[in-house]
């Protein structure tokens, strides 16, 4: 992970700090349908000011996805890990955090049981430079809809296919 520190003096400047862990944006495997629900408040708690009409109930929209399978990719840069003191224990903590990402994470946006980590694939190279590029490793996992599935609604509607890379075997863990 990294950080940008902004400083203000006579001249504004910022300093970027790079960390060894890189986490990409999650991307849906199949297109998702975004549904909307209109919401209102049931009680008007706003006071009427002199000369003003009472405020009407606030109405808004809540948008949600009933089902989506998302893939997130990442990596750990060994050179930056050495420079920053990132350890094997830290890597194990990141791995466990990914596996348990949605444990005790319920909210109105993510009701309990609505989000889960299906599986974590964790590759460990046998050298600092890596046996393969991150892009090649990421492409070695293919996720696609099973034959005959038109509208996926569960993770089981997908096939998870590992294309072997010689000398590099992932650790595969189920999420919690």
Protein language model annotation of sequence segments:
Residues 1-176:
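RNA-binding basic/glycine-rich loop and surface signature characteristic of RAMP-family CRISPR effectors
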């Amino acid at each position: 992970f990294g950080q940008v520190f902004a400083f203000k003096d006579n001249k504004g400047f910022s300093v970027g700090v790079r960390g060894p862990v890189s986490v990409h944006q999650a991307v849906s495997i199949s297109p998702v349908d975004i549904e909307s629900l209109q919401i209102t408040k049931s009680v008007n708690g706003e006071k009427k000011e002199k000369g003003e009409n009472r405020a009407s109930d606030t109405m808004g929209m809540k948008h949600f996805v009933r089902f989506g399978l998302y893939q997130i990719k990442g990596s750990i840069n060994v050179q930056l890990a050495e420079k920053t003191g990132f350890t094997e224990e830290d890597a194990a903590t990141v791995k466990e955090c990914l596996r348990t990402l949605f444990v005790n994470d319920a909210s109105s946006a993510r009701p309990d049981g609505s989000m889960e980590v299906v599986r974590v694939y964790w590759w460990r190279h046998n050298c600092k430079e890596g046996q393969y590029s991150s892009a090649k490793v990421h492409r070695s996992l293919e996720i696609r809809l099973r034959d005959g599935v038109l509208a996926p609604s569960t993770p089981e509607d997908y096939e998870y296919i590992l294309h072997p890379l010689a000398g590099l075997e992932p650790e595969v863990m189920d999420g919690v």
